């Protein structure tokens, strides 16, 4: 899977599962290319979610929700994930 496919899947799965006002998914893999653990088939992702539904939840609760939505992608394609909520 390439990064553009992964970004589209992430956006769709989150948008289909949670009411979001906006979602931004960024590839940050380039920041880690020289790390010993770097693999071409695993990506470093930053997600920024603006959601009324998640806004009033504790950050750990909101993070668990997103992790459960992206469970397969995290197992297979994501090495590192950062999630920010508005």
Feature locations, PLM:
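N-terminal, polar/charged subdomain of small-to-medium soluble alpha/beta proteins
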Residues: 1-86
